Amino acid sequence: MRILLFVSFSGLMFGQSPKLPPDINSQSNSRLPLIQRDQLSDEDKKIFDDVANTAPGRVSMYSPPLAEPIRTLNSRLRATLLGSQMFEICALIAAREFDEDFEWTGHLVGAKRAGVSEQTIQAIQFNRDLKDIPAKDALMIRFGRALFREHRVSPELYAEVVKTFGQRGAVEAAWIMGDYAMAAVALRAVDQRNPDGAQPLTGASK
């Protein structure tokens, strides 16, 4: 669940960002006002309790029928064969490619907790050369960059990914990046801000 990634960060969510644009709500730090639980139906309250303590969850609650399957997909993707480090690397890749500062900030916590190296994190954040990071990390970043930038994966690169992670691992990595690309699109649409105004991606050159 995304709650695991954003739990240490979500406590800051309800503070006001500095110099908010006029279309940004001061409580949510986004264009969407916070949904009030007591205004929901009993059925939707159950969904709210599962998803509403993360920013993507709060966005999805504007369409409750979508919120639960989105949460379930994310939860299942956390239990893949790839393990927590590769999961977090995939999430960071998606956040980087969409310049999604809020998503990056939340997943940076999870990546460090999972043991992703600082060199790998910086290679993703600043689009650095991959020669000095672990080979598996570099391969996953190449896979993600091909998907997001070229919109295709060469036969040679795909074969390398399959050799390293297996067919299932290759597919699961693509789904994880796709899931966080979906979240990034939703967060970009509502202009979700970091509560302290930090811009670790839009403030850094690719």
Place the predicted regions along the sequence by residue.
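Bacterial N-terminal signal peptides
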Residues: 2-12
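Mobile cap/lid helix-loop segments that border enzyme active or cofactor-binding sites
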Residues: 16-82, 205-206
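Short alpha-helical scaffolding segments that buttress acidic/His motifs in well-ordered protein cores
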Residues: 60, 70, 74, 89-95, ...
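Helix N-cap / loop-to-helix initiation motif
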Residues: 82-84, 115-120, 154, 166-167
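Mid-length scaffold segments of soluble, non-membrane domains
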Residues: 87-124
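A contiguous pocket-lining binding segment that forms or flanks enzyme active sites
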Residues: 116-118, 124-143
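Acidic/histidine-rich alpha-helical segments that form the ligand environment
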Residues: 134-174
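Acidic, carboxylate-rich catalytic segments that either coordinate divalent cations
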Residues: 169, 178, 182, 186-206
